[in-house]
Structures are given as structure tokens and as C-alpha cells.
């Protein structure tokens, strides 16, 4: 399915063939971005995520970087480590699922008001399938915020070629011109 973008087969294959569940088994209660990046991301979330909405924090951890003063109806977290997700005070509920094995989200169609993928999209082996699932569960016009970092677990890398094309093809950005 990934070759729908004209990418070679295996373009998103990771360097390390080990099962992702093994890599994510030990909890990592650390910040994956620095204070400046956290402040910038929180500020952006403040402007784009709908207060009172249902949010999906895909590929989450023990912290979501959401503005502390804004309330949301529900924040659904997804990740690979139950300890990390359970430690996240902003999550209303959460689920553990390896999206590289099964990219289908256990959520109803058009049930989410906004979604975030914070510094993690580069670890997906089926990013197009996951983005299609996000398009399915997001309400029409709902934002998807994908943030990036210059940090990466090198043993768990995917080739980044095509991620921007994947995002643009399946979650087009509204025009920002006046």
C-alpha cells in the first residue's frame, strides 16, 4: 500500500528487525524534546486544538504537552508502553497497540475533534495506512498536528523519505492564503 506514493517497496522498513514491543517494553519517562520545543508546541496546541473537544494523542507517552489551562471533553492516548500512558495525567483513557503490526484504530469514524502525533511519526512502517485511519476517525475539518524533532532512536528509524508526501496526500492542509 505504501507504494501508492511511488515509493520503493520497503521505504519505511526500520533498520532494526527486532519486534517493536521489545524496544518499547521499558518505560522511558523522559522528555524527547527540549524546553523551547515544548513551549512552542504547547503554544501551537493552544491555538489549534479545540477546547472542549475530543482529542487523540497518537503515539503518546507520559506527557502530552497540552496547555494546562484548557479543558478538553476527552483525551484518548495511544502508545506502546502502558506504564508511560498510565503516568500521563491528561489522558482520559488510553490503549496500547503496535501500529506497525495493525494500523487500524479502535475508534469510531468521525469521532475525534483533533489529533496529535508528537515527534513519533518517523517510527511508523505503515504511515500511509495510519494517516488513512486518522482521516477516518477525525471529524471533517478536524486538525491533525504532526510535530518533528531532530532527535531519533537510531535503532528504530525508518527512512523519512515520503512522510511529508504521505501527510499531504491523505490529510491535506487548508490554504493559509487570504
Please provide the spans of the model-predicted regions:
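Class I SAM-dependent methyltransferase Rossmann-like catalytic core
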Residues: 1-51
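Class I SAM-dependent methyltransferase SAM/SAH-binding core
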Residues: 32-36, 40-106
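Short conserved AdoMet
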Residues: 50, 125, 139
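A short glycine-rich, Lys/Arg-flanked "PGG" loop and its adjoining helix->strand segment in the class I
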Residues: 128-143
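Conserved class I S-adenosyl-L-methionine
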Residues: 143-176
Amino acid at each position: 500500500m505504501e507504494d501508492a506514493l511511488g515509493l520503493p517497496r520497503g521505504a519505511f522498513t526500520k533498520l532494526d528487525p527486532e519486534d517493536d514491543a521489545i524496544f518499547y517494553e521499558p518505560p522511558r519517562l523522559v522528555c524527547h524534546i527540549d524546553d523551547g520545543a515544548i513551549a512552542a508546541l504547547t503554544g501551537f496546541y493552544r491555538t489549534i486544538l479545540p477546547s472542549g473537544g475530543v482529542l487523540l494523542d497518537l503515539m503518546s507517552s507520559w506527557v502530552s504537552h497540552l496547555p494546562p489551562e484548557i479543558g478538553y471533553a476527552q483525551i484518548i492516548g495511544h502508545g506502546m508502553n502502558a506504564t508511560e500512558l498510565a503516568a500521563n495525567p491528561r489522558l482520559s483513557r488510553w490503549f496500547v497497540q503496535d501500529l506497525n503490526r495493525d494500523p487500524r484504530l479502535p475508534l469510531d469514524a468521525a469521532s475525534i475533534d483533533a489529533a496529535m502525533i508528537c515527534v513519533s511519526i518517523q517510527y511508523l512502517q505503515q504511515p500511509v495506512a495510519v494517516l488513512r485511519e486518522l482521516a477516518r476517525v477525525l471529524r471533517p475539518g478536524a486538525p491533525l498536528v504532526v510535530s518533528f524533532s531532530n532527535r531519533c532512536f537510531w535503532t528504530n528509524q525508518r527512512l523519512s523519505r515520503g512522510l511529508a508526501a504521505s501527510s499531504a496526500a491523505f490529510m491535506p492542509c487548508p490554504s493559509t492564503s487570504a
